[in-house]
Amino acid sequence: MKKITKILKRKFKNFNPKLKEECGVFGISDNQDASTLSTLGLHALQHRGQEGCGVVTFDGKKYHSEKRFGLVGDNFNKEEVLKSLPGNFAIAHNRYSTTAGTTLRNIQPFYADTNTGGIGVAHNGNLTNAITLRKKLV
């Protein structure tokens, strides 16, 4: 491992071998239990973010979203998830904030209905080209 780290430090100027953990992101597609499985995935990633959590599902016609402050296990139970998050596609996110305030609005995933359909997004980090993406998507 030391040899690999040495090579990477030489090749990549800003290489840092220390583990950096930020938000947890989980996705699942084409499964009738997508919301339940995605919350289980978030539970497994809980160590990556404990500020808030959210799930966005898509049922083929409409997006559904639940976002809450706190831990996954405290906010999502199977009955609740199945009722409010129908669909065969889901993305889920645990928040560990590095920028922006601690508000419900900043908990991911984000989704939007646009003139070309819709989109759901969860990311681990900062979108450095957010303005460009917005112009192309909205």
Predicted regions located by residue number:
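N-terminal glutamine amidotransferase
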Residues: 1-131, 136
